[in-house]
């Protein structure tokens, strides 16, 4: 007899917001979501700031969201942890950072600092760059070259000049540091093995090849004149003493989120890299703020804090069969991040990865691979052996990042169609679904004056539990979702999970 599965369905980047203006969630025709919302118990939970282990007021993101969801507790994020280490001075005593400085001194070489130059807080924070500059100043090294990656996605599309000016003020104040190269994150921070993009960023950084400008500001302004926003700024070099990354140099990459920092790091550190032809740098000291992946051979500045008894581990220990399913863009989130930073499958776990479409930007194909994800899940449900399903629909977030209202509405409508088939099937099997999200985005894709808004929001996310006769708590946080799943599965919640079931008892 087929099992009665319990599913967690994450509509990525889908939150509650009162105003209809620029709100694709409100404007989309979503009869299935609305039907479940009217029929079943609902609540809303917090998905940003202190509730997910980020600084107060900081918007959530997919990595943070899935980690909190899977852990069933507040997970203090790298950003909060690094900020704290800078505030209490531990940062300046960090062994790896000081080893990088020592390497530069011993070799009479240069320190290169890579990272996303913004205060978006999703991948990095530019104040961490300032702390590295302060460390260099304290240690008396003068050749410090900053290779800045421009954001325009987690912050305003044209905000780079503000960060560049503040960084140049810091160079002057400390008497240390200069910009060496600048690239839009589209090139330097790809995560889909589009090596042609990475190659352009790499050539600017490593070989000092590319368009040349007298200053970082001049290069960005030239791009703006051609209607190129920060994310897409073509890699360029800044005139100065730097001549690229050379033998004996050191690199500190201050992005703390791994997924978009791994590829560039792999090019520099993995001798087996074959995405394009590279000349390896000899005697290079390469440090990354966190562990990016197993293909990156680097010293780790902030080692991972292990998370035990995440939802996947608890399912395994209770002999449950679980499925993780998503398309490429969100696959690491339902696997690695949901498992607390673990790549290996648990016993009884299987995974389905559906390829994301190969398009330049997802507004060109708002449905992405939602229908294929849905079909794959229906196929898995037909096997009748699943207890737990962890599913992500990427569309509201990935299309929401375009800052375009119509495609984002289409994205949500496509997901709603798929949601209906999936949830109805689970209910027909006697199972239950929790429909929710990991953070906001598609709830506001236009600013009040109709400019594209490509960032996440701090709005609370909806929760629908398709079980009649229960009452949900009025509020909660992402860390309460795993305990709610365990509640539906009648599985005891481990002590490490400090979240609380959203179901009132």
UniProtKB/Swiss-Prot annotation:
Its cofactor is Mn(2+). Mn(2+) 2 binds at residues 12, 62, 438-439. One of its GO terms (molecular function) is phosphoglycerate mutase activity. One of its GO terms (cellular component) is cytosol. Binds 2 manganese ions per subunit. One of its GO terms (biological process) is glycolytic process. Pfam families: iPGM_N (PF06415), Metalloenzyme (PF01676). NCBIfam families: pgm_bpd_ind (TIGR01307). This is 2,3-bisphosphoglycerate-independent phosphoglycerate mutase. It comes from Staphylococcus epidermidis (strain ATCC 35984 / DSM 28319 / BCRC 17069 / CCUG 31568 / BM 3577 / RP62A). The gene is gpmI.
């Amino acid at each position: 007899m087929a099992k009665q599965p319990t599913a967690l369905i994450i509509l990525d980047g889908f939150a509650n917001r009162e105003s209809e203006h620029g709100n694709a969630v409100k404007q989309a025709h979503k009869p299935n979501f609305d039907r479940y919302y009217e029929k079943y118990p609902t609540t809303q939970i917090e998905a940003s700031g202190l509730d997910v282990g980020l600084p107060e007021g900081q918007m959530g993101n997919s990595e943070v969201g899935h980690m909190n969801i899977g852990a069933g507790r507040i997970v203090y994020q790298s950003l909060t942890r690094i900020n704290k280490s800078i505030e209490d001075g531990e940062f300046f005593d960090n062994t790896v950072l000081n080893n990088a400085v020592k390497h530069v001194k011993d070799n009479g070489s240069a320190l290169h600092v890579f990272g996303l130059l913004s205060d978006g807080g999703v991948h990095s924070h530019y104040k961490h760059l300032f702390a590295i500059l302060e460390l260099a100043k304290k240690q008396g090294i003068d050749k410090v070259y900053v290779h800045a990656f421009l954001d325009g996605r987690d912050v305003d599309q044209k905000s780079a000049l503000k960060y560049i000016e503040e960084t140049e003020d810091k160079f002057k104040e400390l008497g240390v540091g200069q910009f060496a190269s600048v690239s839009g994150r589209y090139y330097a921070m790809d995560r889909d093995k589009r090596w042609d993009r990475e190659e352009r960023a790499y050539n600017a950084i490593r070989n000092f090849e590319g368009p040349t400008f007298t200053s970082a500001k001049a290069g960005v302004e030239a791009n703006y004149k051609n209607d190129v926003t920060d994310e897409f700024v073509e890699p360029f070099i800044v005139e100065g003493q730097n001549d690229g990354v050379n033998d004996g140099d050191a690199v500190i990459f201050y992005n703390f989120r791994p997924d978009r920092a791994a590829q560039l790091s792999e090019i520099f550190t993995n001798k087996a890299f074959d995405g394009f032809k590279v000349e390896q740098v000899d005697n290079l000291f390469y440090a990354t703020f966190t562990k990016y992946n197993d293909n990156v051979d680097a010293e780790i500045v902030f080692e991972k804090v292990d998370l035990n008894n995440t939802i996947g581990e608890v399912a395994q220990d209770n002999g449950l069969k679980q499925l993780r399913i998503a398309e490429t863009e969100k696959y690491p989130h339902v696997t690695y991040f949901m498992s607390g930073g673990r790549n290996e499958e648990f016993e009884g776990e299987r995974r389905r990865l559906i390829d994301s479409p190969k398009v330049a930007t997802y507004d060109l194909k708002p449905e992405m691979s939602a229908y294929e994800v849905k079909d794959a899940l229906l196929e898995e449900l037909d096997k009748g052996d699943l207890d737990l399903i962890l599913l992500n629909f990427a569309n509201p977030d990935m299309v929401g990042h375009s800052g375009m209202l119509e495609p984002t509405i289409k994205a949500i409508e496509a997901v709603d169609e798929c949601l209906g088939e999936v949830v109805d099937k689970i209910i027909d099997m006697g199972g239950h679904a929790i429909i929710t999200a990991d953070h906001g985005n598609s709830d506001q894709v236009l600013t009040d004056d109709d400019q594209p808004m490509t960032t996440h929001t701090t709005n609370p996310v909806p929760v629908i539990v398709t079980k009649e006769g229960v009452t949900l708590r009025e509020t909660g946080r992402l860390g309460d979702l795993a305990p709610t799943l365990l509640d539906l599965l009648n599985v005891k919640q481990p002590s490490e999970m400090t979240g609380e079931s959203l179901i009132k008892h």
